[in-house]
Every structure is written in C-alpha cells, then in structure tokens.
Amino acid sequence: MDCIDKSIRRESLRKLGCLPDHGWNLFVQSSNRYSKLLEADSKLFKAQRIEDTVLSICEVTLENKASENALTLFQQLRFYLLNYLFLEDTSEYKSVLCSLDESVYPNLLPLTANICPCILKALLALVRQHRELSSDIVKFLNSIFLALTRILNTPHSSNNNPTHTKTTIFEKVFYASHLGFFFEEIADACISALPQDACLWAMEVCNTILVSDLPCKLIDLHNDSFLHHSNYYAGFGLSYYLYLSSMKAYINSSGCLWYEDATSFWDIVKHRPSSPEEKPFLTQFQSILNLSDKFLSKTGTLRLQEKLGTSCNLFFVLVLKLALLSSSYIGFVPYTYSDWINVLLGSISEDPELLPHLIELMASLACVFPTHFQFAMKRLRLIAIYAPRFDDGNVTYAQLASRKLAQLFNYSSRDTAITSIYQFANLLSPADTPDSYLAAPKERLSISDNMSSSSSQTATVNTISNYLNVIDSVREIALTVNDEKIYGLAISLLIQKFSRKFDSRVSTELVRTLADISTKANDRDFSILVQFYSIQNKMLVKNGDEALTIAICDSRCLIARGTESNSFKRSDLLKSLLEEIIHIGIVRDTPAPELKGYYFGMSKAVQALVECVAGTDWSSLPKEEMYPALFRDMWFTLVINRFRYSVDLGETLEVDLENIAKNSPLLVFEDFGSNFESNLELNTVLRTHIEHSVISQIKSELLVRVPNIDLKPLSTSEICFLSAVLLLESLRCKSNKLSALVEYLLDPSLRDSQLPQSIRAIALYNLTSFVESLSKERRVASSTIDEFQKLLCLCCNRVDCVRQLALECMNYIMETLPHLLGIKEILFSVLELSSLLWKARTEECTDQYVPQLLYKSNKLNLSVILSDIYSCREEVLFQFNRHARSWIQNSSKAIPYQVKNLLESYLADFVDFDDLEVVELGRSLAVELGTRIVSSDRDNFVLPAFGNWTPDTSSEFMAEYTIRQRYSHVDNSILNIEGDMSTDRIDLILNEKSKLFETHLAALKSLEDDILQGNTVSPQRLRNEVRKAAAHAVQEPIFQFSVLARKIVRIPFLDFSPSSFKLGITLWNWMMNQVPSFSSFLISNIIRNWKNEIVTEKRGYFSTAKSKSPLALPMTYSPTERASFLSYKNKVMSQMIPHLLLLQLIAGNFEGFWYGDRQTAKLIVHFMKFVLKKITSMEVNLNVLTRELHFKFVSFGLRIAENLLNSPLGSRFYNLCVDAGLCWFSGMPNWTYGADKLHVAAEISVMRSLRDKLDSFLLRYPLKVSTTLKQKLLIILLNNEMYMLYTWLTPVLHGRNVRMVEPIPDSDAASSPITLEMLQVAWNVSPNIVLYAPKRFQNAPLKQMALNFVIANPFTSVKHEVALEYLFEHYPSGEFPIDRKFILYWEPMYPVSGPVMFMPNVKWNPQLLQYTMRSMESYPVSVTFFYVPQIVQSLRYDSMGYAESFILETSGTSQLFAHQILWNMKANLYKDEAATVPDSIKPILDRVMDKMINSLSGEDKQFYEREFTFFNEVTSISGKLKPFIRKSKPEKKAKIDEEMKKIKLDVGVYLPSNPDGVIVGIDRKSGKPLQSHAKAPFMATFKIRKEKLVDADPEELAVNGTEEEAGDSAKKQTYEVWQSAIFKVGDDCRQDVLTLQLIAMFKNIFNSVGLDVYLFPYRVTATNPGCGVIDVLPNCISRDMLGREAVNGLYDYFRTKFGDEDSIAFQKARSNFVQSMAAYSVITYLLQFKDRHNGNIMIDDQGHILHIDFGFIFDIAPGGITFESAPFKLTTEMIAVMGGSNKSQPFQWFQELCVKAFLACRPYAHYICQAVEVMLDSGLPCFKGQLTITHCLERFALNLNERQASTFMLHLIEQSYANKRTLMYDQFQKATNGIPY
C-alpha cells in the first residue's frame, strides 16, 4: 500500500474501520500488523504508513463503536501513545528518549506533535462514549501525566557532559510540550460532556500543575525548540504556555463538571447562569476559588510576573474567568473582580487578545450577579465603540461586545435595547459637524481611574474605526435581539444618519449593515430601505462614488440571496430595481458632465437584478404590480441606451444580462396582451424623446442581424420593441432557450399587428445560433431537455401561427441534430404528445359538449392546451403526427440502435394494464416505426417478395422487445434449478420454495384481511403482491397452486374495482396459458366467486337498489352541478365494468372448453342459466348504464344456446335468453347517460349483433310459436331501442357527425308488427314489457291493448304505476272498470300527481283518495316539501279533509315544512296584491293555519315565534321606507341601515327562501333600496350556515334521493355563505315561485340523463299577498347593465372578461354559455317565457346565461300583445358568442343540446303539466283555464317520434335565429324603459 497516496490510504483505512463485521476485522488485522512491525523494528517508526495507520485509528475511534471494538481501539491507542512518547510499557513508564540518536531530534518533534494530540483526543472520546472504559482510560492517562511530571521535575544532571545536558534539555522541552498538548486536549474534550470522574481527574491534574509551580521550573529552557505555534502563545515560552493551557483546561473541566459541557456557563443565550441550590462539588470549587485568589492577590501577581518576566495579562484574565466560575457556583463574588476588569481593560491597547475573554467574563458576571449588571453594560458599550479593529476579516471585538450586550438585553426590558440603539446611532455624525460626538468623547475617558490617558487619546484620534464599531454594534444588537421593532428602529436611524460627508469606508459599511438587517425587518421597513438604496443609486449617477455604488450593489445582492423567491421582499426589491434602471435610462438627455457614473450605476443595478430574478416564478407575482410591463420598460431602456445585442457590452455585463434574460418574462404576456399596440405607442420609455441617430442605428443593426426583416411599415415604437426582443431573446438563446420567441405569438393583439413576420424572422435568426451552441455541447443538460419539451408542446398549440413556427423550428433542429431523438425524454415526449392529441380528438366521442382543454402526461412533465373546436384538434393531430413520423424516421437512419432501444423502452414503460388507454397513438407509433428500422442483417433486404409479402424487420423488433420484457424482472434466485443438482442443492431449493410459498401466502392473506376490514390498500401493493404470488404459483404442484390460486382469484372480487379485475383477468389468462391443466380449476373458482358476489354482495348490475325517477327525487333550488352526475356515472361504471370484464373472460374461453373440457363448459352453462334467471326474475338493476352488459349477457346466452339446441336443455335455455332480452324493456324507455358517444355506439353494436343473431335463429331453427312470437317482439323492441339511441347519438344530422355506427332507418321506430299474441306472451314474461311498450311507440291501438291487459289483470297491474296512468288517461274521472279495492294496493304515484287527485274532474272516490294519501305519505318530507304550492291549492277541492289531514300530519314531523305551508297559505289568502279581494279558499286556509299554529307547543312553538318574529322585523322595513319613496337613494339607504341595526338575530332563524340554512350573521350595512315607483323593495345580505354531504355515495344518492338515506359513508360538513335577498312588497311572487319550481323539475330531468346543460332555479318564496323573498343570483350582471357600461355586445363582453377566443377562460365561458342557453331556450319555449328584454337576462362570472323575473309565462304577454313571436330569444349577439353562424361548432352544440333537452323532457310532459294544472284556480294571471294545459302539452309534440321531435326542435331554433320580432321588442324596451340592447 506504500504506492497509494497517503490521504487515500488513510481514508480507506478509516472507512474499513467504520464497516461492521468483516470490514472491522480487516481493519484490526491491518492495525495489529503495523504495531508488530513497529515492535520488531523501531526504524519503521518514521515510515509515513505508520502515521497514517495511527491517524486512521484515531478517526475510527471518534465514531461511536461497540464496547468490544472500543476496547480494541483503546489497546491500540495505548500502544501507539507510549511509543510516540518514547515511554517504556512498564509500571513507571520510564523515558527512552535519551537512547535515540541526536540526529533524529529535528524530525522527531514535528511528527509527535501531529500524532500525540490526535491520540489524546481519541482516548478522551472513548472516555465520553464508553463509561465502562472510562476508569481504565483515566487511570492510564493519569499514569502518563505522572510520568511526564516526574520527568520534568527531575533536576538537571550534575556532570559536565555537554551532550548529556543537551539531551536532558531536549527531553524536558519534548515532554513539557506534550504536557501542554495534554492540557489543550483536555480543554477541548470538556467542551462536550465528560463523565464526572474524568472531569474531577482533569481538575486535579490542572490543580497539581498550577499549585506545584512546575511551569516556573522550566523557565530556563530554550524557547526556540518550542513546538506549538499559536497566534496567542507564540513567543511566550514553555513555562507561560503550560500556565495558559493548564488554566484553560481547569476552566473547561470545572464548567463541564457543573454544566456537563464547558460552554454552557458562558453561553448566556441558552440560559442565565446562577448558583445551584444543591452544591455537591462545593469542596472542589472552594479550592478553585482559593487558588484563584492566590494568583489574583497582589503578592501572587507580582511573583508570577517576576518569574515569567512578562505582564501575564492573558493568564490573569483566565484566572479571573476561573474565579468567576467558582464564585458563581458558591454564590459569592469578591469586589476585586470589577477592579481587575478595569485594570485589564486598561491594557487592551497592549494586549487586544484579552478582549474576547473580558467580554465573555463581563457578560456572565452581569448575569450571575445583577449588582454588576450596569457595570458590565457600561464597559461592554465602551468596548463596542472604542475597541481596536484589524483587517483580518474576522469578527471584530466591537461585534463580540455588542453581541453580548444584546444578549444581556434579554434579561432586562426591551426599552434598554431601544435606548442603546439610539445611543449608538446618535454617535454617528460626520466629524466636521457641530454635533459630532466621537470627535470629543467624554464618557470614554472615565472607564477606570487606572486607564492610561494614552489609550484614551488613541481612541480619540481613531474616529473612523469608532464609526465602524458603532455601525457593527447597531447591526449586532438588532440581529441578536431579534425583535421586529428593533429592526425597524435600526433601519430608520441608520438611514437618517447616512451622510455623504462620512469617509467612504463608513458610508459603505453603513449601507452593508442595512442589508444585513433588512431581511429580518417587516415589509414596511424593508420597503423604506429598498427606496433608500434606489434613491442613493440614482443620485450616484450624477455624483459618482464607485465604492458606495459597489456597496449598494453588494447589499442588494445580499438581500436578494437572503429572501425567498416570490416573497414580498424579493418582489419589492425587484420592482425597485426595475424602476431604478428605467429611471437612470431616462436621464440620458442630461449633459455629459453630470452623467459621471451613469453606465457604471446602471451596470451595478443590472448586477443586483441578476440575483433578484434568480428562481422567480412569474405566475405567482401580484398582477396589479405589472411586473411584465416593468421588465418590458427595462429592456426598452437598455436598448435605447446603447445596451443592444450588436454592441460590445463587455464580458461582465453581457453575462449579467444573459442571466437576467434567462429568468426574464416575455416582453408580451398572453394575459396582458389585450391592448398591445396602444400600450406600445403610449409606453413611458418609448414616448420620451429618442434621437433620430439612435433610431437609425437600431434599424441598421436589426437589418444587419436579421436580413429578412421588413421595417418599412413599422413605427418607431415597434422597431424599438423588435430591438428589445432581439436583445432579450438572443441572450436567452445562449442559455439554450428558444421557445420563448415562439410564445410571443400567443398574444392575440400582437398577432393582429404587423409584427408576427418580424418575430418569426428573429426566431429563425436565433434558431441557427441555438443549434450551433447546442451542437458544441458534449452532453445535453436537463434544462435543455425541458426546453425541447416546451417546443414540442408548442408544436401542438391551438394557435395556428404559434404551431407552425414551432414546427418549423423543430424540423430544422431535427434535420440538423437527428441524434436528439436518442435522448429518452425527447423521444418519449414526441410519443406522449401524440397520445395526448389522440385522446383529445376522441373527446368528441366521449364527452362532446364539455371537452377537456388542458391535457397532461402522467409519465412526463408535459401539458398542452387545445381548442374546444374539434376540427382544430383534428388539424393539430394530423400535423404533429406527420412531423413526428418524419422526425423519428430521420433519426432512425442516423442512430438506428438508440432509437430502436428507446422505442422498446417506451413500449415497456407502463405501470400496469389499467394505466393504458384502449388506443394510444404513441404506443402504436412506436410499434409501427420500430418495426421499420433497418435490421443489422441487411441481407434480408435483398430477398424478393414471396407470397406477396415484402420482408421487413418487424419480427426482429418484436423479438428484442419480448426478450427485454422477459428478462427485465428476472429473479436470479435459488429457484433456478439449472446446473448443480446434488442432493444438498435439491434440498436447498425445496426449502427455499417452501419459504417463498409461505411468504406469498401470508402476503395474500394480509391483503385479504386489509380489504375486508376496510383498510386502504394501494393499487401498487395489490399489483405487486398478486403478481408475485401468481408467478410463484405456476411453479408449484397442484396443492400449493390451488391454495395460492384461490386467493389470487378471490382478491379482485373483494376489492371489486375495474383496475383489480383488469389485473386479475390478465393474470388468470396468463396462468391458464402457463399451466393449461389447471385452467378448469381457475375457471371454476372464478365462477364460484362471481356467483357468491351476485348472491351476497349484489353490487353493480346485480344490485337490488333500483334507480328512481327524477320525479321521485328531491328537487333542489341550486345550480346544476355537473360533478355530481359525473361522480354518479363513475360510481355505477366502476361496479358494472368488473361484471363486463368477467363476462368477456368467460365468453372468450367458452368455445375452448366446449370442445376441450366439456365438464367445465357445462359449469359455465349452469352459471349462465343462473344469471339469466336472475334477469328474468328482475333481480338485476336495469340502470341505463348497464344496457351494454345486459345485452352482452343475452348474446353470450344465445351463443351457448346455439350449442345446446340439439339437446332438451337447448330449447329451454334459448327461451330463457329471449325472456332475458325482453326484460330490458320492462321499464321506462331511457336515453343513455352522459355524452359518451363511444358507449352509445357500443350499445347499438351489441344490440345490432343480437338482432342479427335472432334473425338467423328464426331462419335456421324451428321453434315453438310462443318462442317465435317473443323473438319477433324482441327484434322489434331492439330496433326501436337502436333507433332511439341513434337519434340521441346524432340529434342533428349535419356533416360534423362522427361516423361511428351504421344509420338506423326510420322504419325501426314503427310498432305496426306488434300483435296481441306477442303482447300476451310478453305479459307472461313480465307485465312491464306490455305496459311500457306504448311509451316506446306513438301507436294508439298499442296503448289500448295495454289498457285492456290492465283491466283484465288488475291484480298483476297494481305493482306498476304506469298502469294507473293509462287508466286515468282513458277514464279521467277516476271511474275505472275494475274493482276499486285494487286501487288501495297500487304502486304509489309520483308526488307531483297527488294534488291533482283532489281536483273536481276526478269524481269523489274514497279508495282513490286513500291511495293518493298513501302515495304522498310514502315519500320523505324532503321530496314532498318541494310541492308546497300544489298541496296548498289541493285544499281548494278537499271536501273530505284528506289534504288537510296530510298537511297537519306532515307539519307535525317537520317544522320547516309547516313554516313553508303557513307562508304559502298567507300568500294565497287574497287574489290581489293589495290584499283587498279575498280568495274563495281563504276560510279553509284560515282554519288550517289556526289548527297548525294551535298544535304547536314547546320547542316547536318557540321556533315558530322566533322565525316569524324575525322575518316580520325584516319585512317591516319596507313599510317604514314608504315615506321615503320620493327621497333620494342615499336617504333610503340610511333609513334601511338604521332599521337593519335594530333587528335582533335569534338562534336558529332562517330566510324563508333558504330553509336549508341558518342565519348566523347580518351585514347591517348591506341594505340597498331598489327602483320602484310606488313600492319600497329593498335588498339585504345575510350570512347563512349550511351543511353539505362529504364523501357521499353518488349511487345511493341517486337511488334514495335524500341525504338522510345517503349511506353511512356520507359525512356532513358545515360551511357558511353570504346570501343576498330581495324583500318585495306589492308584487305577487307566486308566479315566479311556480316557474322556478318547474325549472327545478326540468333540472332533475336533465340530470337524470347526465345532460350537459345548465340551469339555476334560484329561490323565491311568497310569504304574504303581494310579498315575497327572492334570492339574489350570486356573481351575476344583467345584460342591460352591460349596455349601460358601454359594452358593445355579449361577444365583446366575453372577450373583455375572459380573454381572446383562443384562451381557456373564453372557451370554458363559451361552453357554459351554450349549455345554459340550450336549457333556458327549450324551457322558454315550453313554458312560454315572455318579456325577455335584457333586464331579465343575467350573465354570471362563468359565462352562464340565466333568466329572471317570470311575470309573463304561458298564456300572458306584456300588454296582452304577443310581441315576442319567436319560440325563444336567440339574438345575433348570442349567436356571435356561439361562433357567429349556424355552421360553427359551438352553435351546433347548442342545437344538439336543445334537441336532447327537448327529447329528455318529453316523457315527463304530463307530470310537468300536472304541476301546473292544480294551480289553475289560484288566480294567477298566466292561466287561461284548461286551454293553458292543452297548449302546454301541444308544445311537447308528443305525437311525433324521436327523430321527428328533433326536427321539430331544429325548426324552432331556425325560427328563433336572429328573429326580427325579438330585435323589435328590445328596441321597444329601450324606447319605453331605457333598457339597452
């Protein structure tokens, strides 16, 4: 090892010793070997390798080793220490130094001086780490100490042999030096905790040396042989050195004994030292005090100084510290300490090294003995001012003193610190000013009477040093006290004291000190400081002071580095620097003599800016500060002031600008680009006078650099802008950043200007330099890879010119540097973006109306924002795919092997199968292009095309990929049975296999338990455990395989998620392929678990929970929440997909089993028979989302039946399949859920395949008549279902429809082939099939046949509500031709139908009324609550008291229901708004109200009184406002605020319009009078506390409909909102109540099919005749208010508020507008909303259009004139928002959504009309009797089929499209009421 470098050898030995076990043993062997060599030959002592060994042992010892290892180390260290000290290993440790030759003396001392202290340090470390070895080590060290003192106490030899005398002297010097080292190591070791026995021993040996006067005996030794070189001790001699080192060790060991470490007593920050209550070491500390007193006595002092021949001040300081330590322990301090301190302070000019000890001493003295506090404070302050300074860069004495001073402030009041700051700051006055304090100081002359006048005079002269000390002191006090006010005070005072009259050194130090304090100051003080720097630097431009300029620059750099990026302080500094550079640039017109330091000042500001912009995230900066504009102005300033790209900027400045450019935002930001050209022309910098010569120079430079640029049509501002862009982006390009130039074109206003071609030219100019610099790099940096990823994302940008420029740049780069695609991240990015673009394009098929705009890659940090226009997405996909192919093919020619390997890696790079999309373009592209890469064997390509096939390399590519996959996770374990197969080897293998089996079994069992207990199981864990177990199972025999396989099959069923089943099915298939003989076992276990799932768990398709009609669910007055029905869809699909995957698995393997394993095939047949029986017995959930699964079950059943038809079982099985198919049609015909076209297409495809198979069966097999009839009926129903779904899939037949399925002919909608015989056999299968058939076909005879079945089979029909509907349709009076007893048992009707049963047209029928009551009572209050207006109106016809009884009973269970009933009854007491004409129902209502109120008691009574009292107080404000009707708005407002203050807020009260929330606060200043001529409505705002469900099961909510029944998983969360409400008086609100009630019903209907439309039925509650409460729509503005704000049109408003048409915000807002426009348009037509002027149309902050004020609906119009003849309002400005024409995609979305909304609500037309019909006699002006209902039904066009209805709606859209009558009405409203349009 001698040939190895010594540092490497030493480090290697150290690392070896730190290793456990084997490494440690090798280390011990090596150490022992060298120790034996040393014993054998002492000459080896000088070998360097021995030294390295010893030092490595010492370093290993410092690590915390085990006890046995520590003993070994101790023995080694003991051996080496004795050898290096030349002591015999005997009991007396005699010296053998004299036996050495004198020639070795000069080399001997440096060697031992290096080694021995290290050994001592290591031994003391062992004492600290291993208490069990402590006594042995201390005993050994004590022996060494005794040996050394014995040698040193030995007198000189008396013989006259000079050689012997020389040896003796050297021996004493040698051992005296090592004794000093001994004490120094003890002192260092005591800094950390040492055991008490070790501390006591150290104190003892120190005391021995100091008492014995041994050092004085060595005074005559030669000092030139002294080894220790120290700044403090050099030249003192051995004697003094021994005194100092032993005293230092004494101090530290005493402190360690007391505080467990030597520094704690002196560290007054951690704690305040004080005398302990218990004093176990009193004797020791008393002896210390006695020794100290001896040395500090006058006799002892003079004696020591006389012997040593020096002042010994440093020693006396140390003695004083030891005395203070001991007296502090004892609790008594002699008065002599202060005298000694004064004496020693007088010596600081001679011995400045005393100061650190004196400072520490005084601080501790002040803490322990408060009587000395002021004494210490005064002297510390004087030291802080007048201490000498040295230019060594270390901490100054002034800093040390002020730091201790500040620490003492913690033990006094904060005022002391403030006073000191003031005192120090007041000393800062230039020497030539009258108030200069330091020029003639007085206080400093009285430190002590013992201080010499010479020292005072010296301090007087050195004022600069004193100024610097004062500044240091202020800084240290501020930073140490750490108080925000202190920071602010220090900054304020130092800024005030700043003066240019100071010496430059003082000014610069003050500036730097401010920087040190600034980062801790609050934001306000920091801003003041930043402005101070800025002002000073601006002044320096005219009056140059380079030192001060540099100091300001350094200070701001320090501040920037000390603040977090994007913090307020960094942002404030950034803003200041930018403004400063701009300001300096504007002074360019100042005469040249005044511009001294102009360029220097600007360059220094730029230098500070470099630090400031580092790491700044521009997106998080405050937008109101306009940082991009400041940067833009800064670059403009640089350009017009000679700092241009073509000018030699200087090396330093160019690097600084390059760093700024790298972190600078674009000169044009997309978010701020709405007025680019005007901002440019009005720019502050560019508006200043720019010399013509400067402009000419800029033009010529641009033309030279970018020859293709055309400057002729550009203005001066635009030319300067281009020059700034060239400078910024060329500098940025040097950092390999090119994408920023492309991003300029994202600004819409820039694109509209004349600059895009110029930007393109600059980009192409920089492109060449970008490629050149990139080609010189040996390795592509990660930042450059990020840049390429940005460029690739820009290649997919939605803006065409951005995309084209990015593609042009990428094409050039890829052609020039094809090896770039050999970088994994870049190639993967190309493929990932291809996949993202494909996914985006398919959104038209999966989520058409609300497409995702932002797409992110899960694998890479990639994101692209795309347009919502699918034609644009198609173009982007086409272009990128074409270029991506070209890039990869080009690179594969240059680096084929790298590209091929990366393509294989990409294909292999996925977590699991469920992470893959069904179609991923990137993966397909990788396969396609990978198989085309030229093979290594080029001979293959000379082969001819045999068999019309051209040879390629696809087989080679797939072979390499397969090998990669096979060996990527190979486990080279002991299970590899190849090779040695001895008996021991086989036993070992079997043993390991058994262990692995147990391990996997335990892991699967743990997985099962966690899932069963509901613990969270990560997908990663589930995948890993099950995969490993499956891989092991296939290697095991049948028993072990069966054990593992059962659990591998069961776990996915327990987890029951799509991902777990995808994994499970993949593994099950793989296991069946690996071990075919176990396939039947696996299939049987899968079927057993599936059957158990169906029977016990009943999830998904086999759930017993049935989805309810939207009319049976609660109706809510809230906006449409798309997330809720998406969550429901995802929940249902997640439980349906597992069944679908299992069916695919079983069906895919059936044929193989049928011909290979008939027993297993029969098992499948029996299972399918079980499933089909479940279906036919209606034990399945026929949810609309399970349509595909249902018909796949039937299709698979038919496949099985085809194999069984020749057997007796076959006919029955086939019949069962047909019955199961018919069962789907036993419910209401439903549309699909959501906008997933792929799902609809799949459903149509499955049904078409099933229909074709049924047709073939009719032709091929003779079947029974009943089976044939059912089969024909099923075919008819399938055709109709497909026709209905096809209509939904293509609601508008335009050219934009994606061709996904074959068109369905209109003939499939007909029902003519359905015969009575078909219905008869269908009735036997399920009566619902017959009952719901008329709902599918517009066929009167079919409906009559269904009615006949009901009449003939009333007992069977009672289970079906629709049967009663047919009876009422044909017998509206209720006189049914059936036994009335059956009515009592009928399925409950919907709550909306209940009140209709009380109307006069239904004849009195007790059974019917009882059935009505049972129906109403079967629904929870949360459902019936919605129908309060209808229930109240039913009292009008309630001759038997049933409705009254229902009201009273329900009111008893729900107080909120009771309150709503009471308010509605009050509102219906009178017919007119003035409450003068009583309604005929008034007596009934009065009676019922009295009963309700009288029945209240207890809490209910109190709640009623609190609520109604509170509400009356609020509404009474309107009455009090009436005298102010003709007063000004401020007067009205003042009156409202006055009354609002009087309102008492009681517990639990609520707004009538918000019964689901409690008022917890009132904004008493929110009152606002509303415009009215003779009434006094007003608006007020309340804080309402509500509850919402968190983690509710969406499926349970949809099924059960109420939050109370939403399952245990749901948790309620409380939240608060501010809700404004309008309190109207004199206006009948009942019509608004009805309208919004109907809108809420429409919302439920639309939600039931997951339709992407938006409605917001806000709340209105009528509380009294002509009175009501109206909720204010939040975050909305009316269209007429936009007109009053001079907005030209809706499109302009959208662009102003949401950005350019290409922006995400605009596209989201436009999508929201389309969704809401479609819903309100359909409802406007159906309910005939009139008076749709712009005052009644609102736009919210998300772009939704909302309608309000429904005073004219149904058969009433303003003025009785039907002015608005259009079906709904569709003006040109609305069309403009939706694309501008009827050919645009958004408008076609509008058409499709209108059609779908119309189709979705048609099945519920009668129920909607029932809600209206019961209100006909209420006296509302909108009704014209029964004619209103007739007209309403006609508008639903129920006589048309689905396609005809869609055409009908399209015709209505065409009629409304820019209708002139609509425009005329808006003009009329503007002329009459001043409403803009």
Curated annotation (Swiss-Prot):
Catalysed reactions, as listed in the record: a 1,2-diacyl-sn-glycero-3-phospho-(1D-myo-inositol) + ATP = a 1,2-diacyl-sn-glycero-3-phospho-(1D-myo-inositol 4-phosphate) + ADP + H(+)
Ranges of residues in domain PI3K/PI4K catalytic: 1593-1861
Region of interest (Pleckstrin homology (PH) domain conferring phosphoinositide binding specificity), ranges: 1492-1625
UniProt keyword Cell inner membrane, yes or no: no
Residue segments, region Activation loop: 1747-1771
Cellular component annotations (GO), alphabetically ordered: cytoplasm; mitochondrion; plasma membrane
Keywords: ATP-binding, Cytoplasm, Kinase, Nucleotide-binding, Transferase
Principal location listed in the UniProt entry: cytoplasm
Region: G-loop, residue numbers: 1599-1605
Known EC number: 2.7.1.67
Family: Belongs to the PI3/PI4-kinase family. Type III PI4K subfamily.
The protein's name: Phosphatidylinositol 4-kinase stt4
Organism in which the protein naturally occurs: Schizosaccharomyces pombe (strain 972 / ATCC 24843) (Fission yeast)
Lineage, top ranks: Eukaryota, Fungi, Dikarya, Ascomycota, Taphrinomycotina
Gene name in the database record: stt4
